[in-house]
């Protein structure tokens, strides 16, 4: 029996699909010989079948499939225990409100959240999804699409989705459409937020009925996060007023939904940037003021170059659970560009 393998290649590597050991190397021919003793008196055809069966048992064993690279970790911050996604869904199913705190540009994290939402819908058919990514004035458009009254093209035209909608948020909307779940368009419309920031008067019905901007820990974290983005203190204060108005709008939207469905007691998942819920601040704090008896859980997304070697001590202070995902690769520079 003659077989060809590359220099330094093991027998099982040789049998793998094309592409394992490519390169500019010369192949060596390896001759494997063996002798089979067959019982005498067998017919020629019987001898052939027996020989083939022996050869099949003398082939080299195949190597076990390589373990898949772990794409995310889920950590319960109270105990430090790592959880599987189904186990996390089991733990969360008894809550009233869950915050999916996200890094908006992390594709891996969005995929995990979409899978988790589906698992929660399996356990809680009364699931409701609230989203920062849609503004309050397009609630009717969102609901019309979920109920099949308009097609997707019309929905996309009038709902003003974020630019990464197709990749990152469409799975959630389609899950809601397939399972007949409600979606809350939670965010404050941008023009209204702009008027809040500039202290212009507004009678917009989409403003939260109550909104405050206290100079508390949330303000401290906000100013720290915005360093290098805004120069003047007054500019920082304007942005903070708009930030707080958005938090109050999203909290109010969820509280109002719960108020008009008092007998359902649904599980609400709120999808939002992690800053709106980390440390129980932002939207999380304002919803707790409006619905103080609700049992909430916060998940915060953490992106690291190597998720297997991470000191999460400080991150564990942010939330009840951490979703640890790889840092997205930096986009390649266009040819000929430098700096």
Q: Where in the sequence are the language-model features?
A:
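Membrane-embedded segments
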Residues: 106-112, 128, 136-141
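A substrate-binding/cap region within the structured catalytic cores of diverse enzymes
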Residues: 123-128, 139-262
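Sec-dependent signal peptide recognition
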Residues: 43-51
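Short internal beta-strands
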Residues: 128-134, 298-301
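N- or domain-start disorder-to-order transition segments that initiate the globular core
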Residues: 57-95
């Amino acid at each position: 029996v003659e077989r060809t393998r590359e220099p330094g290649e093991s027998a099982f590597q040789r049998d793998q699909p094309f592409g394992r050991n490519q390169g500019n190397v010369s192949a060596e021919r390896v001759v494997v010989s063996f002798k089979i003793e067959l019982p005498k008196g067998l017919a020629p055809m019987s001898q052939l079948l027996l020989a083939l069966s022996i050869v099949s048992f003398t082939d080299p064993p195949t190597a076990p499939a390589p373990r898949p690279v772990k794409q995310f970790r889920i950590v319960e911050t109270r105990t430090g225990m790592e959880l599987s996604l189904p186990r996390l869904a089991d733990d969360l199913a008894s809550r009233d409100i869950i915050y999916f705190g996200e890094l908006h540009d992390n594709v891996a994290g969005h995929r995990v959240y979409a899978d988790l939402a589906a698992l929660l819908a399996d356990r809680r058919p009364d699931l409701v999804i609230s989203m920062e990514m849609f503004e309050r004035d397009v609630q009717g458009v969102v609901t019309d699409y979920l109920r099949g009254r308009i097609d997707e093209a019309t929905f996309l035209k009038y709902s003003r989705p974020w630019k990464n909608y197709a990749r990152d948020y469409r799975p959630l909307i389609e899950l809601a459409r397939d399972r007949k779940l409600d979606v809350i368009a939670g965010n404050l419309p941008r023009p209204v937020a702009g008027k809040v920031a500039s202290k212009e008067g507004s009678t917009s019905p989409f403003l939260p009925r109550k909104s405050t901007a206290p100079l508390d820990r949330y303000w401290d974290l906000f100013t720290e996060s915005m360093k290098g983005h805004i120069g003047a203190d007054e500019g920082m204060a304007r942005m903070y007023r708009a930030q707080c108005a958005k938090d109050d709008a999203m909290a109010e939207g969820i509280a109002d939904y719960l108020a008009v469905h008092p007998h359902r007691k649904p599980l609400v998942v709120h999808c939002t940037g992690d800053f709106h819920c980390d440390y129980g601040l932002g939207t999380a704090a304002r919803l707790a003021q409006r619905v103080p008896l609700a049992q909430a859980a916060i998940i915060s997304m953490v992106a690291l170059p190597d998720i297997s070697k991470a000191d999460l001590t400080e991150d564990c202070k942010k939330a009840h659970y951490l979703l640890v995902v790889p840092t997205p690769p930096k986009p390649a520079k266009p040819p000929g560009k430098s700096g």
